[in-house]
Amino acid sequence: MTPTDQEFNDPVGYLSSDKVSKLGATYGLVKIVPPPNWKPSFHINPDFKFHVRKQVLSDLGITTRSRDFFRENINRFLKMRRKRQLKLYFNVQGTRVYYYDLYREVENLGEPMDKEKWEKLGARFGVKASALEREYDSTIKYYATYLHTNCTYDFPESDSEDEYDSCLVCGQHDHPLETLLCDNCDNPYHMKCLNPPLELVPATSWYCDKCLIGTGEYGFDEDVDVKYTIPEFYKMCQDFDAKFIRDYNQNNPLSVDDIERKFWSFVDAEKSDLEVKYGADIHNLRPGEVSGFPMADTPSLDTTDPAIQYYINHPWNLNKLPFSNGSLLNFINTSISGMTIPWIYIGSLLSTFCWHVEDHYTLSANYCHFGATKKWYGIPSLFADKFEKLMRDSAPDLFKRQPDLLHQLVTLMSPLKLVEHGIPCVYADQNSNEFVITYPRVYHAGFNCGFNFNEAVNFAIDEWLEFGEKSVNDYRPIKKENVFNHYELLENILSRFNAKHDVSLDLVKRSLWSFERYVSRLEELLAQLKDKSTVEYKPSVDNNDEDDLCDSCKTHIGFQYFVLEPENSKQLLTPDASPQEIETKPNKNEEAKKVANSQASHDLASLNERKAMVDEFNSLIEKAKKDVDNDESTKVRRSKRIHSLKEKEVPQRPTKRAKKNIIKKKAAQSKLCSECVCPMEGKLIHGKLVLRKQLSTLKELIEETKMNLV
């Protein structure tokens, strides 16, 4: 889009106009080319330095990572059993079959497998069914059984603040000679605390359940000790570009289309050593380092110059856009780094930003100050659900372990594959002095064609309102943190309207409808909770502290929440168990009863139909764990395992239980939103219900708004 000078002076009004907003809804991405005379000067502190992320492109494809994830975990399992290590795939009659794909297909069909099912798989892979069955039984079968018996396993969490290496199961730091260190993660476990317990140090490699099952965690490496200036990073980019052109393009110049083809070939490669660097999410706070746009506090800037003042105050200056006229972020009472305060992105050839949506499904504005093209891909919001389903279906095991995977910005899938599955994908080539706008709940991704300098912020238009509420509901089950209180934003819209401020009537009506439903729900929850606990009125205080989030679901605690008070000991909180877990010295008889009556015990009982397979599995894995050689190499391995713990031997400390589903809290109190407390019906609740605002006050606001709308 090429807005006129007049249109360009009102960004939210322009982007909300029927013509442009319909394009945003249809395509998801809109590129804005400013009027020819709009050219803000670039201002950044000469001392500006930044960290970079190291990105291995072949690690980012969702299919490749799923296969790698499975191979790593099953190979640990096989190593404990002294079995051969697997590659990613095996060949049958010249056809490549991936082990993970075979595992998933068997899981989808469900065990027990019969001849008909194997024939169906053979037809699907285009190979003999007998070859698939033989390979599955010899390599995957027992690992699949292990995963089934541990499908509800909750990983014990290590406390990074612990001074010593304590057993992750019981929390004690004692018996170092009877403590194993996992050969992958180095976490310590008492042999007696394992299930089943071990009597001898294993002769082979030993891995904890967490490393056998896998967490699905992935993140970019970052060298925290290395920072680049812009000239240093530019020189590094030039050197990398020259080498890349020589190695991968026969010294011929690269077009954007060439780079695009090569980018996706690296992403889809099974393994590539190509590593690129990206200065992403840079949020320095010193004056002159927050943004490339001129700001009132930019050092050495002549703020009396009318031309400078023009750009400092222009609504397309990304420091101004989030709170420009018409942006709904004016109704939140705080600044948010990366959302209302710009973050800087300094790209290099092939550096990438993976598929994601913006926080709270807001709109984003990205501006390129200078440099090479940034290639964008976008998925219209109408297809967001279909996209999410495709990603989950492509990597069910990763999503099971990382429910918020799509919010981690570490996963890619080729646009061509999306189109194959009926998901439209659009693109934009962003160049210097151009903006790219992403509309609400538009998944987007892309890569850089070379060195460039961009920055981005978020804002919200009236059409965003329902998307914002949906984001809160979508975040709860995956425990993604809220960035601001959506319902406080609605409250502020109604309050400003009642105070005779100029607020769109349509926006007020939609806000009122949503807010009234929310208050009605709070009233229902309050009725359930007030008889179970004491009620305290505690007026809310404006802050943007993490303390405003529910300790369970990470949703904003809102206008009422539940405080779990300490009672004789620290209380530990979980949405899946009683809201109060008291730390006491365990009684062995009581512990035995708990185990006997636990969900795990019932789950085990349900596996009786497959008892023969499980028994065989247990026998084999126990043999691998307990088989101790008497030769010198075994003594060396045993010494290696316990050496670090022997050096750290300290006086015994009080017991600290690390129970399943328990969230560790430094503070004595824990906060739960009322939505998380109410499902605990019938369970003992020790604590108090805190009202930040009386429901009567919220109802009065609703009634006043209705009267003013008449």
Listing of model-derived features with the role each one plays in the protein:
Residues 1-105, 120, 132, 139-150, ...:
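Eukaryotic low-complexity, charged/polar intrinsically disordered regions
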Residues 1-54, 153-171, 177, 191-197, ...:
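Conserved N-terminal structural segment that caps and organizes enzyme catalytic cores in eukaryotes
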Residues 69, 73-76, 98-101, 116-120, ...:
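Acidic, Ser/Thr-rich intrinsically disordered and amphipathic helical segments
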Residues 79, 123, 419:
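Short polybasic/polar patches that bind polyanions
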Residues 80, 109, 146, 623, ...:
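Surface-exposed polar/charged interaction patches
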Residues 88-109, 113-158, 209, 428, ...:
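Chromatin/DNA-recognition segments of nuclear transcriptional regulators
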Residues 179-183:
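Extended, structured, electrostatic nucleic-acid-contact surfaces
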Residues 434, 439-442:
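Structural motif
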